[in-house]
Amino acid sequence: MIGRLRGIILEKQPPIVLLETGGVGYEVHMPMTCFYELPEAGQEAIVFTHFVVREDAQLLYGFNNKQERTLFKELIKTNGVGPKLALAILSGMSAQQFVNAVEREELGALVKLPGIGKKTAERLIVEMKDRFKGLHGDLFTPAVDLVLTSPASPTSEDAEQEAVAALVALGYKPQEASRMVSKIARPDASSETLIRDALRAAL
């Protein structure tokens, strides 16, 4: 089992980062809330990983800290929530925001996430709330807002296309993803900024 990777970022294609360690390039799927905090390509990064084996694929999911990974593992134990949906949930809101939404039973915030209907949101609140009681020490200390670094490289159409592709990968329908990006698009924004702003606007 691969639990942690330390290496050089070769490529960032939201929501996937290609990380080289020991001469091997690992494709790691990351929630966008974690992806925003990665350094630029060519720099070193450390990610905590969860390895998922399926019949048709072997996938690595990466996180900036163990707490985010713990939450991801708990999410995929929930009936009807697989790794892809868990990734979408933690892209739409930070791990701390999700914990807060569950503990405050904010159904409205959860159903705005892609792939989450009312029944799934209710199930998440019921199942995750119980698990948080035993996990609190392992999860989060008092809430701290994430400081998101502004990504470099300004682009325009390419950035918009990348942002749409990333939102589709997170579970949004292509037309919906295009609409979300066009609403907040601006010429100097990078794809990461567009994704972040589109997800914020959706909530």
Swiss-Prot record:
GO-annotated cellular components: cytoplasm; Holliday junction helicase complex; Holliday junction resolvase complex
SMART domains in the record: HhH1
InterPro entries found in the cross-reference section: DNA_helicase_Holl-junc_RuvA_I (IPR013849), Hlx-hairpin-Hlx_DNA-bd_motif (IPR003583), NA-bd_OB-fold (IPR012340), RuvA (IPR000085), RuvA_2-like (IPR010994), RuvA_C (IPR011114), RuvA_C_sf (IPR036267)
Gene3D superfamilies per record: 5' to 3' exonuclease, C-terminal subdomain, DNA helicase RuvA subunit, C-terminal domain, Nucleic acid-binding proteins
Region (Domain II): 65-142
Subunit note: Forms a double-tetrameric structure around Holliday junction DNA (HJ); the DNA is nearly flattened between the 2 tetramers. Each domain III contacts a single RuvB subunit, 2 on each side of the HJ; forms an RuvA(8)-RuvB(12)-Holliday junction (HJ) complex which drives branch migration. In the full resolvosome a probable DNA-RuvA(4)-RuvB(12)-RuvC(2) complex forms which resolves the HJ.
Name of the molecule in the record: Holliday junction branch migration complex subunit RuvA
Biological source species: Salmonella typhimurium (strain LT2 / SGSC1412 / ATCC 700720)
Lineage: Bacteria, Pseudomonadati, Pseudomonadota, Gammaproteobacteria, Enterobacterales
Gene: ruvA
